[in-house]
Amino acid sequence: MNILIANDDGVFAPGIQALAHALKPLGRVVIVAPESERSGYSSALTLDRPLRPIQISEDVWAVNGTPADCVYLSMNGLFDFEFDLVVSGINSGANLGDDVLYSGTVGAAFEGRLMKQPAIAVSLAGSNVRSYEHAHDYAVAAKWVHDFIQKGLPNLPPRHILNINIPDVAALKGERVTYQGLRAQSKPITSHVDPRGRQVYWIGLAGEAVTDPKKTSSHIQSDFFAVANGYVSITPIQMDATNYDILEDLQTYIG
């Protein structure tokens, strides 16, 4: 099996290094990742300048582009063989709820699925994760991904991926199939004056989880709930954002 690994934290991030090490027993593992952090790039492709893949070492490549660029190049001519699976991650920080709209980790996985291959996005969720600098900090999560893939991935419909969030705990309680939760509105922007006297702004941090009262009665819980309780969250998500429930009503309204 040929496995392509991408991320949005950059080619030297500890999460992707841990993941590559864990998956090598499953087949050939190739890392193609941004040369520096590209968080928040979603599924963006670079169309205004050429991309420059550089081989760092055997089966490790850095690209001066986005996470989706890395997958697109890898599956459209950068290599003389085909990939069987795309794994994006392990992201430094959660991609829960509305995070998937912005996530480069999820964007890379979607790009792989557009290329007709199975794809999963994997993130490590926890308050201390962003300070981790070593691959061993991701060892528990990486082993879980290895075991999950080794068991055989479920067959998903076209244009669907699995968004997986692994809590940063010493002992995982198990897995839960989840729905995509909701976040409260992001915290306000912060304004400062830089050393040259110019007004600059920082976008606020993501909001907290919001409970959806319509779904609390279901035995399927949100991704937020699963992770907060020590379970791996496995959420099937799709590229088609059409709300089919209101199509007929909207057609009637429009006339």
UniProtKB/Swiss-Prot annotation:
Its cofactor is a divalent metal cation. This is 5'-nucleotidase SurE. It is found in: Cytoplasm. Keywords: Cytoplasm, Hydrolase, Metal-binding, Nucleotide-binding. It is an enzyme of class 3 (hydrolase). One of its GO terms (molecular function) is exopolyphosphatase activity. Pfam families: SurE (PF01975). Binds 1 divalent metal cation per subunit. Nucleotidase that shows phosphatase activity on nucleoside 5'-monophosphates. Its EC number is 3.1.3.5. A divalent metal cation binds at residues 8-9, 39, 91. InterPro entries: SurE, SurE-like_Pase/nucleotidase, SurE-like_sf. The keyword ATP-binding does not apply. Signal peptide: none annotated. The keyword Phosphoprotein does not apply. It catalyses: a ribonucleoside 5'-phosphate + H2O = a ribonucleoside + phosphate. Disulfide bonds: none annotated. GO terms for cellular component: cytoplasm. The lineage of its organism: Bacteria, Pseudomonadati, Pseudomonadota, Gammaproteobacteria, Moraxellales. It comes from the Bacteria. It comes from Acinetobacter baylyi (strain ATCC 33305 / BD413 / ADP1). Belongs to the SurE nucleotidase family.
